[in-house]
Amino acid sequence: MIELFFEYIFPLIIIALKVVAITIPLILCVAYLTYAERRVIGLMQLRRGPNVVGPFGLLQPIADAVKLLFKEPIIPTNADKILFVLAPMITFILSLIGWAVIPFAKGVVLADINVGVLYILAISSLSVYGIIIAGWASNSKYAFLGAIRSSAQMISYEVSMGLVIITVLLTTGTLNLSQIVEAQRTMPWWIDLMLMPMGVVFFISVLAETNRLPFDLPEAESELVAGYNVEYSSMGFALFFLGEYANMILVSAMTTTFFLGGYLPPFNISWLDCIPGFFWFVFKVGFLLFCFLWIRATLPRYRYDQLMRLGWKVFLPLTLFWVVLVSSVLIYTDHLPNV
């Protein structure tokens, strides 16, 4: 009986504890990211932001959570009730399970699988289904139009994202995210320089993937009232809200892993190695999240034709050209990784 416990049950308990250890801090980070967003945008607009609930407004996310929890969940009469309830759950769950393959520090990763890049691409592609289901199940023209916009936007920018990731795979020679980070430790500086434009393209693409300004057309308030979640209230709205911000943190972690060295120090200086890798990872992700908030506070929304033109006529040809360029340079300089 004891052997059965240690062989089958104990590993499941360890996995459950690891999942809880990632999920709870992540939900707290999402809650306080909303607070940080309101404070940062307030400062940029020369106002205070939330500062009443608790010292410096630090209890504002808890007040918002309690408010949403006790609101009445309203389901439209003609809505598909089962899908209407499932849609926000799908969005929120998919935003969490992508973290399984993200390396927080050396050896600190929930599932260190050899196809981590394919896993993360699959999860990011599936995340749009929650929005599409919400738009269709709501039986509202505004919600449905927001869902259609979201699917078109995802298709347009997922292609460019995939090609950008191919350039990273060409230089590192692996689909394992931990190995991608370690490969950047010894990567020549000129390869890093060559990947910089693709890092910018990737970051702009994930802005579109997460429906953030200037690409928030699926929930454009001035056109679609609130877009795909116009009919949601209470915890349904809260789960969409949490899913959006959890996706922001996830794509920032992906950008950090692919282009900023993950948990590695920013410079190859010996004394920087004394600082734990987790600190560098959090610092880089925090910087990218600040860029998300900065962009929201300063840039206007794109028109829909501008959004499509940027994805298909600018990013797609540019990333295709860069894949050929990186391949040619690596072959010419004999720097193709030994796979």
Swiss-Prot record:
Domain of life: Bacteria
Major subcellular location class: membrane
InterPro entries hit by this protein: NADH_UbQ_OxRdtase_su1/FPO, NADH_UbQ_OxRdtase_su1_CS
Gene Ontology terms, MF aspect: NADH dehydrogenase activity; oxidoreductase activity, acting on NAD(P)H, quinone or similar compound as acceptor; quinone binding
UniProt keyword list: Cell inner membrane, Cell membrane, Membrane, NAD, Quinone, Translocase, Transmembrane, Transmembrane helix, Ubiquinone
Any single Pfam family the record assigns to this protein: NADHdh
GO cellular component terms attached to this protein's record: plasma membrane
Subcellular location: Cell inner membrane
GO biological process: aerobic respiration
Quaternary structure note: NDH-1 is composed of 14 different subunits. Subunits NuoA, H, J, K, L, M, N constitute the membrane sector of the complex.
Family statement: Belongs to the complex I subunit 1 family.
HAMAP family: NDH1_NuoH
Protein name: NADH-quinone oxidoreductase subunit H
